[in-house]
């Protein structure tokens, strides 16, 4: 079996077991609506993971909306009607130029997090640039 095939099967096995987090044990739900919400949450997490880690091109990274108040498939970890979060995995060996427009944002930052081991959640901020560190032109471009 190829490494890709093994990884795919491992993903499917993991997905197959994830619903036990809300179907079994002391936090189990029985209401159809709550069960549907659990599956919706799993699908949302999978969608974010695929968009952030499977589809990006390392040579041309793009920011992916991972939490917005308007996309229902990108509302996870708690709603925040005032914030938009984007993610962009990068190669620590490369340099990047980020440009955009701050729009009507009250606060804007670019934050880099570590990856303690492949696939692990970050546990440390390794760099941050806040809007007070960025030069904007008259139209809000940077």
Regions of interest found by a model, annotated:
Residues 1-142:
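A compositional/structural signature for long, glycine/proline-rich flexible linkers
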